[in-house]
Amino acid sequence: MTNKFILKRCTVDAWDRNCLETSLTSLKGVLTDTALDPEILRKLLEFQAEDGSFLLTDSWNMPADARVDYGYVPTYLGAAILMRAYLAPEPQLPREQIADALVRALRLSCKRRLAGHGYEAEEGTLFALRVFKLGGLRDFLEKDPAICPEFQAVVWSLIDEREAQLKSEGTIQGAWQEDYTDAWHELLEEIRPGRRRYLAYGSNMCAEQMRYRCPQAAKIGVTYLKDWSLRLYGVATIEPNPGDKTPAVIWEISRDDEKSLDRFEGYPECYTKQNFIVTVQGTRFSVMAYVMTERNKQRLRNTTPSEHYLEAIRRGYEENGLGEGRPTKRSIPSQP
C-alpha cells in the first residue's frame, strides 16, 4: 500500500481534479486497509496542515462545496485513520504523537458539525459518521472521553438529535424529502456506545435515587456547570445565566440506565438532551444533561416543587459535599 499512497496539495489557482481525487482515494484505501503501515502514518503526519486539517489545496479560499469535498472530507478521513491508529493495542508510532495529531484533526473536523454541503447536508453527516465508524468511533467515545471533548460533544449531540427526531416523528428526511430513516437507524445502532457520562443537577444527584433508576450507574465525580443556574418549575432544570454556576454530579451510565432516565424525564417531550464540556479533577470531557423544554416550562409555570422533592436534591448536595447553590425558593422562577 505504501507505494500507492499518494497525498498531494494542489494550488487553488491551478485546479487538478485528478490529483485531488487520487489523494482522496489514497486516504480511503488506508482507512479500509487491514493493517496500518507505519510509513504511511508518518507521511500522513507530515502532510497535516498547521490548522490540523488534511486540506488537499493550498488555501481554504475556494467555493463552499469544494471546501467540504477537498478540505473537510480529507480531514475526516485523516482523523479517522489517526483514531484507528490511536486505538490500536500496539500503535505503530508513539501514542502521544498520534494523539496530538488526532486532537488537532478532530477540532477542525467539528467546525461544521460534520454537515455536508448545501442540500446534501444530511447525506454528508451520514458519510462523515460512517468514516469515523471505520476509525473505531464507538470505542473512542466510550473509552477515551477526554480526547478532544469538543468533537465528542458534537457527535453525541448528533446522536441525541437524530434519536429524538426518530422517537418523536418516526422519520428523518433530507432537504428534498429523501428518506434517511433506515440509514440513521442502522448507523446509530453501529456507533452508539454502551455507556456515556451524564450530568445530574437535581434529585438524581442522590445516590439512593440513582440506584433505583440506574442500577448500573457509577459515580465519576462532582463539578460545577459554569454559566448555568438551577431553576425549579415543580421539578428541576437548568437555564443559561452568565457568571453563575450549578453544582452537579457526573455519573457513567449504561444504555439501559439512559433508557430508564428517558422515561423518568419524559424525553424528548418534557426534556431534551444537551451536551456540555465539564472538568472533573483536572480532566475535561463531554457530558449529557436533560434540559426542560419551553413547552414543559409553560405547562409547569404555576407548579411548585414538593418538600420531598427538594429534600432529595438537598440530600444529593450533602452526600457530595456541595454546600453552595442548595435549592431554595429563589430557585423557583417568578410567575408572570
Identify what each model region corresponds to:
Residues 1-193:
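Preference for long, amphipathic alpha-helical scaffolds in soluble/luminal domains
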Residues 192-336:
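Glycine-aromatic micro-motifs
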